[in-house]
């Protein structure tokens, strides 16, 4: 029997050229952690197989860190999931040209379902859709606007053949209050596609709980603030997740 492994994706969120973490996705709640490349290379050195790289300025529609992200991806030897502001053909193709293994669509999937369905058809498992949730309402545009009912949007994405979902409880993100296990369980009951959890991971115990969902279709977890805050190290987390 294959051992159940939870993939871990340490996050590097970039705003104004710096690696930062937000609390509940609020602009202005940033804590800066220095150069993004230093953070990304540190996670690679610690054994990460993935890095979750986010352009917050693009997500909030206030600019872009494209040149810097290109430099980060070029220096890494691990897989990169790229997120933030990918809303049309130009930004999607640009993200894939950077060398990202996978691209997260957020706002676009809510605001332009026709384009999203076409992107999924064209690029298959290179596309993941980020579902950022408050209760069962989706948040759009850097989490500042409502994006509709989670289950209605999920049904539409299932019909479009979406390959993977990244599910974030916005109320938990950056708070170190633990992941929303109930939301993830509901999501896993409604899709056969792999799901990646994001938001709230605060302890190794949280990762134990998430790993228990792997047999039900949870593929991985994005870990951010807990690593930066020193709640645990990435090697410790990888051990708990079943890697190494």
Swiss-Prot record:
Keyword Isomerase: yes
Subcellular location: Cytoplasm
Record-linked NCBIfam families: hisA-trpF
One example of a Gene Ontology biological process annotation: L-tryptophan biosynthetic process
Protein's organism: Renibacterium salmoninarum (strain ATCC 33209 / DSM 20767 / JCM 11484 / NBRC 15589 / NCIMB 2235)
EC number: 5.3.1.16
Assigned GO CC terms: cytoplasm
Catalysed transformations (reactions): 1-(5-phospho-beta-D-ribosyl)-5-[(5-phospho-beta-D-ribosylamino)methylideneamino]imidazole-4-carboxamide = 5-[(5-phospho-1-deoxy-D-ribulos-1-ylimino)methylamino]-1-(5-phospho-beta-D-ribosyl)imidazole-4-carboxamide
Name of the molecule in the record: 1-(5-phosphoribosyl)-5-[(5-phosphoribosylamino)methylideneamino] imidazole-4-carboxamide isomerase
Family annotation (InterPro entries): Aldolase_TIM (IPR013785), His_biosynth (IPR006062), HisA/PriA_Actinobacteria (IPR010188), Isoase_HisA-like (IPR044524), Isoase_HisA-like_bact (IPR023016), RibuloseP-bd_barrel (IPR011060)
Record keywords, A-Z: Amino-acid biosynthesis, Cytoplasm, Histidine biosynthesis, Isomerase
Active site residues of this protein: 13, 132
Pathway, per record: Amino-acid biosynthesis; L-histidine biosynthesis; L-histidine from 5-phospho-alpha-D-ribose 1-diphosphate: step 4/9
Top-rank EC class of the record's enzyme: isomerase
UniProt xrefs under CDD domains: HisA
Gene responsible for this protein: hisA
């Amino acid at each position: 029997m294959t051992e159940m492994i939870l993939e871990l994706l340490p996050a590097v969120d970039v705003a104004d050229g710096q690696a930062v973490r937000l609390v509940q996705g609020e602009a202005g709640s940033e804590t800066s952690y220095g150069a993004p490349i230093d953070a990304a290379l540190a996670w690679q050195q610690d054994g990460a197989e993935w890095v979750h790289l986010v352009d917050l300025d693009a997500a909030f529609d206030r600019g872009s860190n494209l040149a810097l992200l290109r430099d980060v991806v070029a220096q890494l030897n691990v897989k990169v999931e790229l997120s933030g502001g990918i809303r049309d053909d130009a930004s999607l193709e640009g993200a894939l040209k950077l060398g990202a293994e996978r691209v997260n669509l957020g706002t676009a999937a809510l605001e332009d379902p026709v384009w999203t369905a076409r992107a999924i058809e064209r690029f298959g498992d290179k596309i993941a859709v980020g579902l950022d949730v408050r209760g069962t309402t989706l948040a759009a545009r850097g989490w500042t606007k409502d994006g509709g009912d989670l289950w209605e949007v999920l049904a539409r994405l299932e019909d479009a053949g979406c390959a993977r979902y990244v599910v974030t409880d916005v109320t938990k993100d950056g708070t170190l209050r633990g992941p929303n296990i109930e939301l993830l369980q509901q999501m896993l009951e409604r899709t056969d596609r792999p799901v990646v959890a994001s938001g709230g991971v605060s302890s190794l115990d949280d990762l134990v709980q998430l790993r228990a969902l792997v047999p039900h279709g949870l593929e991985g977890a994005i870990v951010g603030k807990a690593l930066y805050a020193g709640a645990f190290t990435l090697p410790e987390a990888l051990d708990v997740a079943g890697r190494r």
